[in-house]
């Protein structure tokens, strides 16, 4: 039978990938890429340009819907996290509706069949109506036309009217949630037995909670943005930007931004009503629904209505089409070209990995970072000319942008122009106007450091917000400029047990970083916004004047190595980087002698090779999936990973110094 998860896959990926989970796609793509290039590090291309939020929220429930077989892996920390989230959400849902007649298909046991769950659901709804006693049924199951309807809860009122609730492990709604309403509403309507009158999303509440807690609220409004980021105006930055994360006004404001939007159920219902009246003209539907919603301030509302109407008008054809792709075909996944990875509704989570596959299979222009060319710009160029090359594509793109903008110096034009200088250079390098002035800010004395964190909707520490990045590791190297042999520099690796982490651990981090004469040191990081925000958060948690002063002194002397490679900073441009600037993109072009001089090793030689793996291991300890002995070994491996990030920064610095000496 078709599930909602399969239906949703139709809107952000090619047809051949519909039966595959993210893990399946990652594995298949990795195998294909190995045939083209032995040194490809696929993780880079998945991560870079993907995370748009300062705090990136992973909806673990969504990931498990993609790969439900993981639910049987009791050792998976994300599964345990999901179980905690679901159980707490159920309690908050029951509390919201003030009902004591609570039923759950999970109580039928793990061996219960879908048919048994369907029969149980129908029986309990009939009982609620006959007894005139409202009920909540968790994990109900309905079926119609070989499709399953599976909200996380249905509230059945005494008169037979129903309300659906879907649990989301995020603090935001996204426009793709409207697709879930369309699927459930139209199928439930087709079922014909009951009437759906409301649809809620049970969202993680953006509020301060103590350790091991998570709270939810029910929301009918959906943000119309494609991703979960919350943009900030200049006025908002002035009003709230300077406030600490735990300021009540700031929390209330952010919560209001996250929870506002358009009533998704009302939108879908209005579109359905006018279609049922016989109107199929798109402009007439848009005009009617826009007038009825009476919400002109909602961003892109007419476009939202248009796209909703298109899906509802073609719903049954979409259902039939998706059904044909439920089963994985016998032939090998070939990653046929498709521009479906950037739909109106959603960006495919592994889109940057797909770009890398397309770069090797179809055109080199797919290699480019989104900082140089957006996905739709690349796709459009490839459609027009299958043999298009990077230099020709970027030149034409720049010509078009130059005609459209009044001030090219402040637009994407400048970055493309800078990169093309490197592309056309014999050595593949361009030196920008700001390189010398930026590099001169790096002092002789330095503290290189890197943080690793744990992030979850379930709080790791008291009085924290959901998905706060709690620092669990800090590797640092202090170079007071007395040792010329950088391989002899000693790295201090701090790591804290997530089970017991607290304020004293944050003090230990700040104390280790702080130097008596901070203004004589550069505190070297890679992508300073992350470390800066973590430092400010730790200072807020500690809430003591001396530590706030120390943190401020460190922040005032931060030096971001990533600034050298970001095209927008007009420092250095490298043809080899294709517009990317992540540390793992930069490292492959660093001479081995600099890696050896800094004692930087290949990430492939480490047990822990990626940041997301480090986070998952730390989460595993927090959720008691690792015992004392297992944690002791894991901690050693995590230290090696974090230390390598720090030593890699020294290698990059040596590389740049050599470039200045020999090529400038």
UniProtKB/Swiss-Prot annotation:
<protein>
    <recommendedName>
        <fullName>Uncharacterized protein MG366 homolog</fullName>
    </recommendedName>
</protein>
<dbReference type="Pfam" id="PF11074">
    <property type="entry name" value="DUF2779"/>
</dbReference>
<dbReference type="InterPro" id="IPR021301">
    <property type="entry name" value="DUF2779"/>
</dbReference>
